[in-house]
Amino acid sequence: MKIEVKESTMVKPAAETPQQRLWNSNVDLVVPNFHTPSVYFYRPTGSPNFFDGKVLKEALSKALVPFYPMAGRLCRDEDGRIEIDCKGQGVLFVEAESDGVVDDFGDFAPTLELRQLIPAVDYSQGIQSYALLVLQITHFKCGGVSLGVGMQHHAADGASGLHFINTWSDMARGLDLTIPPFIDRTLLRARDPPQPQFPHVEYQPPPTLKVTPENTPISEAVPETSVSIFKLTRDQINTLKAKSKEDGNTVNYSSYEMLAGHVWRSTCMARGLAHDQETKLYIATDGRSRLRPSLPPGYFGNVIFTTTPIAVAGDIQSKPIWYAASKLHDALARMDNDYLRSALDYLELQPDLKALVRGAHTFKCPNLGITSWSRLPIHDADFGWGRPIFMGPGGIAYEGLSFILPSPTNDGSQSVAISLQAEHMKLFEKFLYDF
């Protein structure tokens, strides 16, 4: 598939915005220094001005006024800590055309093909050189359109990023701002002096793979990875949830806990982990509803903490299907205000937050990361030409990282997008649907 860029514009806020440096909290900084990729797809409506660049750029320029940090650049303070320099430098808006059709992307698995729908960012010139938000509208020959989004992770997490994108789409439809962004991250400042009360296993190094005769690598080469997406219907999710009552269990586990636990179990089985192998699950956990007092609606930034149950693979595989969900459930129950405030303090005492940033070394076999977008309004970006037929990650950077996505049609189904070693993917699919 060929994609030809027609025009690239740096879109700036439509009015004067505060010129300031925005302080970042510890949870803004303990994230990978890259642009989180996501892609929306839209079917044609027959409208003559379908995804008109002028309409989109005008609305974008308007949305950047209240969300002015999005138009800024990263910089460092005198201690080397990353801040956002808010001077209205602008966001990159690219318009492109493709000789392909939307259906060429099949089930929209976040493969390398999807990655070309998002502008590539050149990180080689330093952190002040690139836009925090890069956008690409690609028109396909079927009349459909994709919107590719790359959002610098220090600028926003999923909830804040979608608050911005959905405000932009509302403004393109002529609507006004409903919830203003709250631009002050000092609400997540550590206590002075910091008083961590817990050991914070989530920031400790993960278990390493025990070498057995079965998994001894033949060469030093990094194993080939594969990315797939699997859909589970509402009936399948309900069947899975009903399994929480097996073997006399009386605790009520949510559909999410059962699904995430089942993904963890299926991954352990597909990887053929040794019976005594420890495995750590990393669950991205939004602190907005857990902190007390709760953050103002529209708090703009990162409020993602990490829940990390650890279990032995043999237990996950041999115990009832709800066992993995019980490990998640218990770990999530601990994520209250005291724990999250302690995490902010724990991070404050670390000499180098970069050392704690999660990456390939974190999620790889025998461990797993799960990020759920199920409760996020990922399908609300209606720019005046209807809701997207799909929205999901535009790539999965690491083996062992997965996403749970809600249905675009609200039919109760969920999809699991995951990156695993290629030799484990077929087995994962088998175990995922076997319950």
Curated annotation (Swiss-Prot):
Alphabetized UniProt keyword annotations: Acyltransferase, Transferase
Annotated GO MF terms: acyltransferase activity, transferring groups other than amino-acyl groups; shikimate O-hydroxycinnamoyltransferase activity
Reactions the enzyme catalyzes: shikimate + 4-coumaroyl-CoA = trans-4-coumaroylshikimate + CoA
Tissue note: Highly expressed in stem vascular tissues.
Active site (record annotation): 153, 382
Gene3D superfamilies listed in its UniProt record: Chloramphenicol acetyltransferase-like domain (3.30.559.10)
The keyword Acyltransferase is assigned to this record: yes
Documented EC number(s): 2.3.1.133
Top-level taxon of the source organism: Eukaryota
The keyword Acyltransferase belongs to this UniProt entry's keyword annotation: yes
Known role: Acyltransferase involved in the biosynthesis of lignin. The affinity for shikimate as acceptor is 100-fold higher than for quinate. The most efficient donors are caffeoyl-CoA > p-coumaroyl-CoA > feruloyl-CoA >> sinapoyl-CoA.
Similarity remark: Belongs to the plant acyltransferase family.
Name this protein carries in UniProt: Shikimate O-hydroxycinnamoyltransferase
Gene: HST
